[in-house]
């Protein structure tokens, strides 16, 4: 049964018995929640904040993320490419995002600040006003990507082949 939550704060105790899949959350705060391997299939998050949450390996199949902020979260092994692009609006601050995939995504107006993106996949992405401020890209894959709208200010460990990717001239 689909539930709607508005302007609510969730801690781990409130999450333990809640079925997340298929619900809608608007203007909600998830603080210190352990949600690893949870299915968010067909879930809608609008103007929500995840702070110090463990979201490793969550399933985002047909999950809408509009105005969602992730602060100091663990987001390892997530496939963001399963989120519909028309509802995609996210920001990441000081997150661990190892083995995360953005394959083929349109990353428009998305801001990554001080994130650890080791071994993540950015193949086939299109970046429009995408900021990667202070991020670590150790062993990340960039292949057939349009990076002309990407800002890699203060980013480290990225290796981008200009013959396989579109970059600013």
PLM ranges: what are they?
Residues 1-169:
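Tandem repeat scaffolds
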